Amino acid sequence: IVHAEPIAGNTFRSFPGVVKAAQQIELGFKTAGQIKQLCVDEGDYIREGQLIARLDDTDYQLQLAATESQYRQLSTEMTRLEELHRRNNITDNDYEKAVAGLEQLKVQLESNRNTVNYTQLHSPISGYIQAIHFEKAEMVNTGTAVVTLVDVNNIEIESELPASVYLQD
């Protein structure tokens, strides 16, 4: 890489080149699903954090609701089991299994919350939507690029210079 430097005099030379964004990002969802909404069009300028697209989260919401219900039920049951354990009316082994079950359910609950959040695609940077690769109602897999985002605040210019020009003092 050679950095441009000023030269003495009024010398002007022209060379063919390509101007491109220094950063181009292919954005996709962290979960699979059917696209419910595209909130941008090609060429749109978007800000960091802005919503780009949303998947249908119906099934994920149902899974979350079921896990929340199980967690509430087991939490209530744990209150009773703690009292029974304190009075030595259940074995340590049974109590420890119940505690472990509640912890596993807590992890599953957090995972389900994350999955619901992953149905929304937000921009990690400000930039322009260069391309949209899917349409509303299409199915996408985890990690599949839905849009291409470019940051035009930093650009690169690629050009080939003849050796005779490059070697001049």
Residue ranges and their predicted role:
Residues L38-C39, D44-L74:
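Structured, soluble extracytoplasmic/luminal domains of envelope-associated proteins
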Residues I1-A32:
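N-terminal beta-strand block that forms a small beta-sandwich/beta-barrel module immediately after a flexible targeting
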